[in-house]
Amino acid sequence: MMTVKCGLRHRAFGIAPIFVSILLASSGLVLPGGVAVAQKSDAPEKEFEDFDRTKFERSTTIDNEWFPLKVGTRWVHRGSTTERGKRVAHRLVTTVTDLTKVIDGVRTVVLWVEDYKEGKLDEAELAFFAQDKDGNVWSFGEYPEEYFNGRMIRAPAWIHGLNDSTAGIMMPGVPRLDTPSYSQGWAPSVFWTDRGKVDQMGQKTCVPLRCYDDVLIVAETSKAEPNAEQLKYYARGIGKVRVGWRGEGEKLQEVLELTEFSQLAPEALARARAAALKLEKSAYNVSKDVYGATTPSEHMPSAQHR
């Protein structure tokens, strides 16, 4: 489960700890105070989502209330994760740039992500998202560079339409509890098999920035990580505010909380754009078979929105 989809670990719930909600999930009950937990859906799960490029008429206007991607928005999440058997400090900085990139005929918004472990850059990433006319936010792939001791060691890129990779839904337009899980993308060449499922709604959680009511929790799983779930907490109009986990198979046990939420000034946005373009230049050199098959990103003011 990719780090960019960060949420934040549970610390405060409205009327009950998370384990109570988990125990009640199979019954489909609504707890006091309006807290709703998932129930088993009879609808079949799709291996892949039904992608139709004609449904992305205003693809770069990503205004899904749970997953808004407004140009210049920056989230900073802090917490910890497990690395080589010990807990280490973790900081994630996610920025919506003013770049777009056309992938398989759909213009996507480019996110620039920096992942720090113990104060050192562990990964830098470009991620690509678009919204369809039903409000679903789709992931069209990513280009991550992973580092060790300051040197890039690998870049497991995947892009929709290349190497049997397929775009997936990161956030439904209207999340509902009684729906099956959905593919968040399929990329067998880099073992990307993530799926999401609406787990709980109407929750309350508190992070260093503030407390949030009516929080949506999405549980994410992967074929590569059985018996492991990453829990992403979303607040309306903000996006991801917390990341937690559950399951005996969860190895990283990543915990993150939103500590900063801001809108960049023009100068800072220009610096983010330059950094993203520098990473893209590297991508064309490193990932010639995947990223090299894509068209260059464009500055949004000069790009035609689709």
Feature-to-residue mapping (PLM):
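N-terminal secretory signal peptides that target proteins for export/translocation
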Residues: 1-15
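Boundary at the C-terminal end of the N-terminal hydrophobic targeting segment
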Residues: 30-40
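Bacterial N-terminal signal peptides
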Residues: 14-32
